[in-house]
């Protein structure tokens, strides 16, 4: 019975790990030409939101001031007016092109993420029996571990996710989600989320240890608190 569970659970676990990556890669390649063609031919707006437009205008003004200052300090500024205009035109085109590529990247990744969530949801729904077997197999594996290893694993996972050094990891993860879904980067919101999520998770873990582990395995709780101290 254990061997049968392992034969079913291991391939299913591997498929769960690699399916999102495979779906993302496949749909990125297949959707990219279609989205690029749609954006360049039918989309009238250059910017996805007002924040992007504001950032581009600020960058354009900055470039214009830098080039103007550069021309003013030259010996014969009048002879460089035409060159100045040409250079500003080139930089403007490059700036808009860069933001156009960035918008395509946002739309492509957002579409791929939505499709990936839908496919994963359907996969879990259709493979409900395999999911139950996987859950049973994991519970058996955890049950066979010693209390010391269990306590060490809990301590390691909690330190990685809600420990003192987890802040930078949360910033990278939330920033990555922001980029994938095309949300404008906001340091205040990210800072608030980084300071909130670990606290919520820490509270949930403490409640789980107090409510569940104290009832199931008091010795595990004692070992965990001893290691934590």
Swiss-Prot record:
Keyword hit for Magnesium: no
Organism per entry: Dioscorea elephantipes
Catalytic activity of the protein: K(+)(in) + H(+)(out) = K(+)(out) + H(+)(in)
HAMAP family membership: CemA_PxcA
Membrane-crossing residue ranges in chain numbering: 7-27, 106-126, 154-174, 189-209
Domain of life: Eukaryota
Pfam families: CemA
GO MF: antiporter activity; proton transmembrane transporter activity
Lineage of the species this protein comes from: Eukaryota, Viridiplantae, Streptophyta, Embryophyta, Tracheophyta
Gene, per the UniProt record: cemA
Membrane topology: Multi-pass membrane protein
Protein name (record): Potassium/proton antiporter CemA
GO cellular component: chloroplast inner membrane
Sorted UniProt keywords: Antiport, Chloroplast, Hydrogen ion transport, Ion transport, Membrane, Plastid, Plastid inner membrane, Potassium, Potassium transport, Transmembrane, Transmembrane helix, Transport
GO biological process, one term: potassium ion transport
Family (UniProt): Belongs to the CemA family.
Functional note: Contributes to K(+)/H(+) antiport activity by supporting proton efflux to control proton extrusion and homeostasis in chloroplasts in a light-dependent manner to modulate photosynthesis. Prevents excessive induction of non-photochemical quenching (NPQ) under continuous-light conditions. Indirectly promotes efficient inorganic carbon uptake into chloroplasts.
InterPro entries: CemA
Compartmental location: Plastid, Chloroplast inner membrane
């Amino acid at each position: 019975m254990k061997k049968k569970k392992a034969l079913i659970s291991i391939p299913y676990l591997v498929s769960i790990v690699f399916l999102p990556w495979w779906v993302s890669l496949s749909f990125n390649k297949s959707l990219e030409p279609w989205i690029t063609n749609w954006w360049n031919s039918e989309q009238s707006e250059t910017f996805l939101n007002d924040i992007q437009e504001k950032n581009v205008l600020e960058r354009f003004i900055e470039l214009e001031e830098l080039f103007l200052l550069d021309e003013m300090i030259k010996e014969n500024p009048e002879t460089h007016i035409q060159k100045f205009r040409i250079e500003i035109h080139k930089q403007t085109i490059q700036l808009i092109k860069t933001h156009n590529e960035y918008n395509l990247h946002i739309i492509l990744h957002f579409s791929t993420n939505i499709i990936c969530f839908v496919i994963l949801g359907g996969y879990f729904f259709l493979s409900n029996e395999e999911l139950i077997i996987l859950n049973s197999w994991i519970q058996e594996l955890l049950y066979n571990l010693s209390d010391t290893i269990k306590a060490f694993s809990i301590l390691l996972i909690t330190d990685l996710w809600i420990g003192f050094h987890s802040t930078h990891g949360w910033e990278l993860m939330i920033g990555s989600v922001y980029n994938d879904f095309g949300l404008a980067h906001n340091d205040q919101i990210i800072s608030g989320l980084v300071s909130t999520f670990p606290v919520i998770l820490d509270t949930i873990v403490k409640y789980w240890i107090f409510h569940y582990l104290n009832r199931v395995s008091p010795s595990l709780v004692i070992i965990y608190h001893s290691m934590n101290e």
